């Protein structure tokens, strides 16, 4: 059985990256929550 995590930086940033977060309203809400929480990293 193959492992479920197959690392791929391009896919990672396409799905979880800053620009993809900014491109939708809910993504912006995610960033807002993470800022208010004081996260060092906002997105992948």
Swiss-Prot record:
Coiled-coil parts of chain: none
GO CC term, one of those recorded: ribosome
Keyword check for Ribosomal protein: yes
Superkingdom of this protein's organism: Bacteria
Gene Ontology terms for molecular function: structural constituent of ribosome
Keyword Isomerase: no
One example of a Gene Ontology biological process annotation: translation
Matches recorded under InterPro entries: Ribosomal_bL34, Ribosomal_bL34_CS
Disordered: annotated span: 1-44
Compositional bias ranges of the Basic residues kind: 1-19, 30-44
Keywords: Ribonucleoprotein, Ribosomal protein
HAMAP family noted in UniProt: Ribosomal_bL34
UniProt xrefs under PANTHER family: LARGE RIBOSOMAL SUBUNIT PROTEIN BL34M, MITOCHONDRIAL RIBOSOMAL PROTEIN 34 FAMILY MEMBER
Family designation: Belongs to the bacterial ribosomal protein bL34 family.
Descriptive protein name: Large ribosomal subunit protein bL34
Biological source species: Bacillus pumilus (strain SAFR-032)
Gene: rpmH
